[in-house]
Amino acid sequence: MLVLTETSVGFVVFKLSSDAKIDNKDLWKEFETPEGANKALKVQAIQRFTSTASAVEDLTAVQDGRLTDSLSRFLLDTVGGADDGEKKKKKKKIEEMLVVSDPKLAGTINKALSIPVLSDSSTQDLYRGIRQQLASLLGGVDQKDLNTMSLGLGHSLSRFKLKFSTDKVDTMVIQAIALLDDLDKEINIYAMRVKEWYGWHFPEMAKIIVDNIAFARVVKAMGFRTNAVTTDFSLLLPEDLEATLKSAAELSMGTEISDSDMTHIHSLCDQVISISEYRTQLSEYLRNRMQAIAPNLTALVGELVGARLISHAGSLMNLAKHPASTVQILGAEKALFRALKTKHDTPKYGLIYHASLIGQAPQKLKGKMARMVATKAALSIRVDALSDADSRSDVSAAEVGISNRVKLESRLRALEHQAGIQSVRKVVSANGQQGRQQPRFEMSGVTGSYNAATDNVPLNGDLLPTQPATEEVKEEKDEKKDKKDKKKKRKSEVAEAGDVTMDGDADLSMVAGETKEERRARKEAKKAAKAAKKAAEESGDGDKKSKKRRADEDEDSEKKKKKKKKDE
């Protein structure tokens, strides 16, 4: 049985002795000593690498499972077999099995050279022993020299892989933008902690200095608020803020803190300052990386938005495979699927919303602008991804992105003109400043004046200027009282008229002059008439009910007769 091994020296074929069984569980004991290893394996043939470049080429092909021409000729000369499926006639065919470490390479050798191969988990102990005793098996090779050759070849192979890796720069951009987001969160958390901590000592300072980094620098320079008067803030703050800060420090309502408290606050300020400085360096690094990997995309949407798009897609090549519609909503997948589920309108933009071209567009045109920016961004991404590395480093590499940006800006101005929207960028004031200026507020109309004479209290018996108003109030009260009296009188008249008409059936002329006995007799007669009327109504209802009952009985009898006839 023959064993193929890849080493830093070259390809080596060993002859496995008949005493050493490859399926033996104790095979590793044969390689505990150099003597045992030489007894189990003998060098059958060796093909040395002529140069580092050829070694890198052959080993890269072997790792990919490909069979190079040099390795194919070496195996044909050493093991035998058939070249390109044709049987070899001149050379003697060797009927021995070849052990290969890589299963993919083993399948390629068997298919191309018709050599029986073995590559499974049972060969792991064998190759582990070969690597352990390789110097003694090769014979005459120093272990230090072998290690040096392996190290040099490993470095060359790694450089070769990195050189042709399509994701090598994408990884740097993805990690940089993720770290930038983390640093922003850390700076925000630490800065808020500094403000809350130092606010017990100087609470007014948080309203005067809004910037977090400037706040930390001022706290670091000033220390206790009593030192504000003697501290020079000219390098940190403008003159007006410096004067406001010093005056507020003298009248502060904060509590006193100890030296140990101030020491810890200073340490936290150092953390905020150092992290902010590193964030500036990282931002510059990211900008340079984006200029190198995607100059057109950077010129169109900026380095931060471009880096976030690449990070979300996974790599520049994956981003180049997306259509413009996907680039437009990239980052808004959650809102997209929620809209599809609820059958609502889908989102118009995702991460691309933070591009400056969309930010400067009016709210009415943001959706249309996002669609146009995504279209041009898709073209720029494909140019960056599929162009050569040398062309990306050229000065004119961002020509496509710059030209697309100019077109989009002119298109935005045209859309604003069509919609009748005045752009903020076009407005120029009289003094040459950009943007709309708020008009100065001016008082208009006639303003009233205060009557100071009403403040004087008269010492004599004269009436006050407001006294005549009491007569008008009295007249209003009298009018209200008269209205109430008239209303009560009308209600009483209506009530009396109702009492008279209650007995409308009786003779009113007799009611006025009748006695008690006559009134009693009249009431009894009236009751008797009502009772007779009620009895007559009840008798009429009884006749109706009896007639209805008789009709129902007749219908029931007819139904019974019909049923009997059917039964018969």
Curated annotation (Swiss-Prot):
Required for pre-18S rRNA processing. May bind microtubules. PROSITE patterns: NOP. Gene3D superfamilies: 1.10.287.4070, Nop domain (1.10.246.90). Residues 293-417 form the Nop domain. It comes from the Eukaryota. The keyword Ribonucleoprotein applies. It comes from Cryptococcus neoformans var. neoformans serotype D (strain JEC21 / ATCC MYA-565) (Filobasidiella neoformans). Residues 522-533 have a biased composition (Basic residues). InterPro entries: Nop56/Nop58, NOP58/56_N, Nop_C, Nop_dom, Nop_dom_sf, NOSIC. Residues 430-568 are annotated as: Disordered. Keywords: Nucleus, Ribonucleoprotein, Ribosome biogenesis, rRNA processing. GO terms for biological process: rRNA processing. Residues 471-482, 534-544 have a biased composition (Basic and acidic residues). It is found in: Nucleus, Nucleolus. Pfam families: Nop, NOP5NT. PANTHER family: NUCLEOLAR PROTEIN 5 NUCLEOLAR PROTEIN NOP5 NOP58, NUCLEOLAR PROTEIN 58. This is Nucleolar protein 58. GO terms for cellular component: box C/D methylation guide snoRNP complex; nucleolus; small-subunit processome. Its main location: nucleus. Belongs to the NOP5/NOP56 family. One of its GO terms (molecular function) is snoRNA binding.
